[in-house]
Amino acid sequence: MTFRDLLSVTFEGPRPDISAGGSGAGGGAGAGAGAGDTASSESPAVGGVPGAAGGGGGGSVVGAGSGEDNRSSAGEPGGAGGGGEVNGTAAVGGLVVSAQSVGVGVFLAAFILTAVAGNLLVILSVACNRHLQTVTNYFIVNLAVADLLLSATVLPFSATMEVLGFWAFGRAFCDVWAAVDVLCCTASILSLCTISVDRYVGVRHSLKYPAIMTERKAAAILALLWAVALVVSMGPLLGWKEPVPPDERFCGITEEVGYAVFSSLCSFYLPMAVIVVMYCRVYVVARSTTRSLEAGVKRERGKASEVVLRIHCRGAASGADGAPGTRGAKGHTFRSSLSVRLLKFSREKKAAKTLAIVVGVFVLCWFPFFFVLPLGSLFPQLKPSEGVFKVIFWLGYFNSCVNPLIYPCSSREFKRAFLRLLRCQCRRRRRRRPLWRVYGHHWRASAGGGPHPDCALSAGAALPGAALALTAAPAPSSAAAPEGQAAGAGRRKPPCAFREWRLLGPLRRPTTQLRAKVSSLSHKIRAGGAQRAEAACALRSEVEAVALSVARDVAEDNTCQAYELADYRNLRETDI
């Protein structure tokens, strides 16, 4: 059963002055069927849908069609007599609308409103929450923008055409509407393709991801994405389409063979191939990396210390060159932190799982349409019936409605952001620098002393209001140290303490999850024993920089990458 079968609409003829309605004198009803049978009708048939007219003063006429035009049939409604109600239809203004058409209209209106509201929530969630403003979420916002444009500018006219049974907005606007439809759908699909590539980079290079995928690169990628979508959608506007039908009440996507194949390849099959390859790679990398990290954590558990936190103080004891205050850090000794790497990788893998669900739903929604469209253009005898095609076509539209519903079900961050928006708790704070920022150079592990002390946090020392006790980090083993420096590898630097400063800063209304992450982090960044240091390292006002050092790879000659804690007094849960 199609949308056309669910509704019946007909224009009324000149309404005579009748005192008695219903089936009174002169009243009667005629019916026109889409198969070609007519009853006392002189209305022409358009798109395979003949008109029907009924005589008398109180009758109403139902005209239904079952054309094979695949996007929309343009049946011309028959004429009807004056007021009254027959077989569940009622006169509303100049139209006689059935109860089924009202139900279909209400359903489609709810469908469109859900899509608009859901995509608006995604956009506003990222705009109102600084911790959600990441490159990956920018791609998600672009996906929501494409779906929002589709829901707000295309779907209302598609729904109107389904309810009325014909296109009522003119030939010129039909061409524009079809082009915007292709533009938004192509941009949505290409956004999912971009997201899959972004997730592969995030999982494959989780520590170097901020340096690889910058905001400037993301903006260039999005500009290219919309340019490709625009090129695909401009074909019919430039004449790459079938001959224009004479009746302006017919409007549908072009079935010209060349354009159907071209648009299907560019809008679906090539992006889908990239998506499938990227997520297969994500699965392989995630499985191998998880195993190696778990094995590394087991090995590290048996070691006494690992340096994670680096605090550089002004005016501290200098190295051999006696140059205090230098920001350089070559020659500092520290171990790798597999625990931090595992934490960061697990977050990337979780985001990849969420977006894999989005991509799976996308394939289920769009594959039937992009399979049927070129097939019907190449082999007209294989065209599906109108009812089957309409279900397939609106299934593609359904993808724009379901994407915003996936995020709160699989992402607690988006769920909390949605709830805050629904409670009108959008509080945009001033822009700050990212909490973790990549240095422009690498730090090489060695046993030599540096211009600043190398401090690490003692376990259990990050208590609110308490002085922060720090102990010096031991040098790495002789096997990890450069050749010729094994003698100094076993020496420990003098202990240092850092007082009157809170590592995690003042937290406003911390959630249970945030407290758990804070507790976990305070135990992960530790070195040596829990003994408290005696000498003061610096006061809070003397802090120059706080950095997190993470090993990249043993095969890279123990080169390490440092992440700077730019604003340590405002720590967010997603920054841990």
From Swiss-Prot:
Cytoplasmic compartment residues: 127-138, 198-218, 281-353, 411-576
Matches recorded under SMART domains: 7TM_GPCR_Srsx
Entry keywords, A to Z: Cell membrane, G-protein coupled receptor, Glycoprotein, Lipoprotein, Membrane, Palmitate, Receptor, Transducer, Transmembrane, Transmembrane helix
Chain segments carrying region Disordered: 1-82
UniProt-recorded name of the protein: Alpha-1D adrenergic receptor
Gene (UniProt): ADRA1D
Pfam family, one: 7tm_1
Single annotated GO MF: alpha1-adrenergic receptor activity
Biased composition (Gly residues): 21-35, 48-66
Localization in the cell: Cell membrane
Biological role stated in the UniProt entry: This alpha-adrenergic receptor mediates its effect through the influx of extracellular calcium.
Tagged with keyword Membrane: yes
GO cellular component: plasma membrane
GO biological process, one term: positive regulation of vasoconstriction
Cross-referenced PANTHER family: ADRENERGIC RECEPTOR-RELATED G-PROTEIN COUPLED RECEPTOR (PTHR24248), ALPHA-1D ADRENERGIC RECEPTOR (PTHR24248:SF14)
Spans traversing the lipid bilayer: 102-126, 139-164, 175-197, 219-243, 257-280, 354-378, 386-410
Organism: Oryctolagus cuniculus
Quaternary structure annotation from Swiss-Prot or TrEMBL: Interacts with FLNA (via filamin repeat 21); increases PKA-mediated phosphorylation of FLNA.
Sequence similarity: Belongs to the G-protein coupled receptor 1 family. Adrenergic receptor subfamily. ADRA1D sub-subfamily.
Annotated membrane topology: Multi-pass membrane protein
